[in-house]
Amino acid sequence: MNVSIEQKYQALLNIVPFVSHETMNDLIQFESLILQWNAHINLISAATIPVLWIRHILDSAQIYPLHSNFLHWCDLGSGGGFPAIVIAIFLKTKKAGHIDLVESNGKKIAFLRTVISQLNLPATVHHCRIEDVYQKIKKPDVITARGLACLDELLQLIFPLLTQKTIALLQKGRDYAIEITNASANWQFDLLKHKSKIDKNSVILEISHVRSCRG
């Protein structure tokens, strides 16, 4: 899909009300790096390359405005940098805040660190399993995860990182209602559902005050 930079910019403005030229330039550079590296390592599905801007970058960008006032973010299973790198780009423009990225794949770690270095982003990559990061980072204000695990497993993973004020923003597809039902057997939590601005069948689950029912 041949889309001009101006068209990309207008599409982004539909997601995030104000976007600086610096932010837009960084997002374009990130898109370029994704395409370069994807020829050698699997960062995104080949089927989504023609719609990379919409399917991955805009899908990630819609996360940030939900809680742009928070400064300390953490993304679990960061993979190709969605939504983590996109959030880091917005934090850079704000000139405040930081995001921790947790990823176990060495090749993807190399990619993420390259992007962070080239774009001078306020982000740190932790090369470890999620369970091993609990003692390495400060408990965040916001936790994100995209396509990582079912909700029940995600709540188990994020539980040690939570405070009473922590919010989790978890992107989910068409089966989200089933995941909520299954997770509710083991967890109690406050929930807000935000409809995705990119995919009508997807949502962003805003979860807080997580309590285990397992005793």
From Swiss-Prot:
Give its localization.
Cytoplasm
Query: Any idea what job this protein has?
Result: Specifically methylates the N7 position of guanine in position 527 of 16S rRNA.
Q: Which family does this protein fall into?
A: Belongs to the methyltransferase superfamily. RNA methyltransferase RsmG family.
Cite the InterPro entries for this sequence. Answer: rRNA_ssu_MeTfrase_G (IPR003682), SAM-dependent_MTases_sf (IPR029063)
The positions annotated for binding S-adenosyl-L-methionine are G77, F82, I130, E131, R146
Q: Record's Gene Ontology CC terms? A: cytosol
Q: Which organism is it from?
A: Bartonella quintana (strain Toulouse)
Record protein name field:
Ribosomal RNA small subunit methyltransferase G
Cross-referenced SUPFAM superfamilies, in alphabetical order? S-adenosyl-L-methionine-dependent methyltransferases
